[in-house]
Amino acid sequence: MTTLLNPYFGEFGGMYVPQILMPALRQLEEAFVSAQKDPEFQAQFNDLLKNYAGRPTALTKCQNITAGTNTTLYLKREDLLHGGAHKTNQVLGQALLAKRMGKTEIIAETGAGQHGVASALASALLGLKCRIYMGAKDVERQSPNVFRMHLMGAEVIPVHSGSATLKDACNEALRDWSGSYETAHYMLGTAAGPHPYPTIVREFQRMIGEETKAQILEREGRLPDAVIACVGGGSNAIGMFADFINETDVGLIGVEPGGHGIETGEHGAPLKHGRVGIYFGMKAPMMQTEDGQIEESYSISAGLDFPSVGPQHAYLNSTGRADYVSITDDEALEAFKTLCLHEGIIPALESSHALAHALKMMRENPEKEQLLVVNLSGRGDKDIFTVHDILKARGEI
């Protein structure tokens, strides 16, 4: 199929979907390309970002956790966005695209529930019906977000098949869309999946990095030495990285979930510890068995519990432009506690992975003068019960 935009990032990406979905993807690509050139669409999108979502978000300098080091650490505060995470940015763009295509329904998948909440709020705002697929395990561990979705009129459909987590919700959402694409838009929640989704999601998240660049230049008079973001599917990270990719003096660091430790096999780090395959409509690194079956990923954070990764991250990793590391559950939990105790900010467990790596960089070389920015992709309200149960089991509370 001929596409308007390049469907690949190097060897990664593509459109590996049933033939029945090709017209839907073609229509979506055409709508996106025309919308990007339409001043009216851009004005409407920017108005929603500013006056509904609350952009630009703050860039907060950490006051206390850098004590005793020469590190200056800033947090890009996507946790302050309406909806509680960066997810709100791109769903507003996709919901406007759905209206532009004449769709009346939204289909979405969600892991931590943040994309589900974002899809529900955008659908409510723009008068679209919304149904959300969510792994049954995630429905249990993210009950506050499930109720938020219900409050905003969305139907939440628990998925019991497979591992009953995000990968299974993705499969069910795609299955639904293949039978309903004439009236429904599939609002994919991350910068992964078949073309044109990785490109659409990046472009609807790139204001994170654009704002960060302007804010850090105003505050510090220079660009950061590195920007750091957690990577599940990779949308918050690609949103932060996009405007810095050509700034070769700025390090790009993506942080995958190390779970119980890479050596245990219980993690979600396919970029560094997976093999390239075809899954979820794209060619990308993924966690798979010797015979090519998709393995279950694991993370304390439901939003990072994904067995593959967006194709642009795979490309940035293969070219060496970005570095990808992993952080374990325990390290993320310590970073979560540190930010709460010393800065008065409760981060999402997803974002805590990125923060943990920044703290590691700072502590391993306290004498080094470095300017770091962590993308604090979401707030941790949804995670307080998970953290409470772990700390209680350890006898810490």
Swiss-Prot record:
Keywords on record: Amino-acid biosynthesis, Aromatic amino acid biosynthesis, Lyase, Pyridoxal phosphate, Tryptophan biosynthesis
Domain of life according to the entry: Bacteria
EC identifiers of the protein: 4.2.1.20
Presence of the UniProt keyword NAD in the record: no
Alphabetized InterPro entries for the sequence: Trp_synth_b_CS, Trp_synth_beta, Trp_synth_beta/beta-like, TrpB-like_PALP, TrpB-like_PALP_sf
Pfam families referenced in this protein's UniProt entry, alphabetically: PALP
SUPFAM superfamilies: Tryptophan synthase beta subunit-like PLP-dependent enzymes (SSF53686)
Cellular component GO terms, alphabetical: cytoplasm
Catalysed reactions, as listed in the record: (1S,2R)-1-C-(indol-3-yl)glycerol 3-phosphate + L-serine = D-glyceraldehyde 3-phosphate + L-tryptophan + H2O
GO molecular function annotation: tryptophan synthase activity
Modified residues (N6-(pyridoxal phosphate)lysine): 87
Enzyme category, top tier: lyase
Span of the signal peptide: none
Cofactor(s) required for function per UniProt: pyridoxal 5'-phosphate
Keyword Lyase set for record: yes
Pathway: Amino-acid biosynthesis; L-tryptophan biosynthesis; L-tryptophan from chorismate: step 5/5
UniProt function note: The beta subunit is responsible for the synthesis of L-tryptophan from indole and L-serine.
NCBIfam families: trpB
Subunit field text: Tetramer of two alpha and two beta chains.
Family: Belongs to the TrpB family.
The name this protein goes by in its record: Tryptophan synthase beta chain
